Amino acid sequence: MASKAFILIETAVGKTREVASTLKSVEGMQSVEVVTGPYDVIAVIDAPDINTMGTLVTEKIHTLSGVVRTVTCVAVGA
């Protein structure tokens, strides 16, 4: 079952645009936006299942230089 999530990302000072640019090339990213507020970037990801989503977040997002913290909000329906 396909899974969708919103990833709220806090970046290191001066790294926001670099992180956003790198995220756009990661497979599974539906959209990446630089935003204002307590988070610097919001990414929307699609994955075939929750395990793949977890791997994407922990291995592709958490490991990026400039990423300080993330919050993953899994979509549960409308």
For the regions a language model picked out, list residue spans one by one.
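A compositional/biophysical signature of low hydrophobicity enriched in polar/charged and small residues
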Residues: 1-78
